[in-house]
């Protein structure tokens, strides 16, 4: 699963890295966690950008997942990362992990999903992501390939939740 952080504020004098979620972001992020529970797509591992808005998004998602939530790890390299870096982080996932959630930033989240999505992907989900990847958007992909072997069009995009 690949998720974009929820909507972030831009307070005067705050660095981009330290931007907090807006009230809307604080409402939308937990909805994604609830959707995961309702649809049985709870991650075994979560990797989040270390920026404040992604950490806050991750906290809300984990709060909704409750005791099913794994301990999230923060990855500095996901902040403003190009697509290849996001894919590299995914590729380093231990093979014992079967379900991963990455929480990162636009446009890398959109580009990574479109890079990974095969022609067998859900048409509407693919079209939705092609049109944009809004804050708190979530793409759910599946694959039989090992994480380290993912190099493009290797996964089936099953769902795209755009808030």
What residues fall within each predicted segment?
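Active-site-proximal alpha-helix that buttresses catalytic centers in soluble enzyme cores
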Residues: 2-78, 118-122, 133-136
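Short phosphate-binding loop-to-helix
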Residues: 78-95
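Domain-level recognition of soluble alpha/beta enzyme cores
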Residues: 117-156, 160-162
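Short, well-ordered alpha-helical microsegments
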Residues: 54-55, 83, 109-110
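Hydrophobic packing residues within well-ordered alpha-helices of enzyme cores
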Residues: 57-61, 86, 112-113
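A glycine-rich beta-strand to alpha-helix segment
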Residues: 98-119
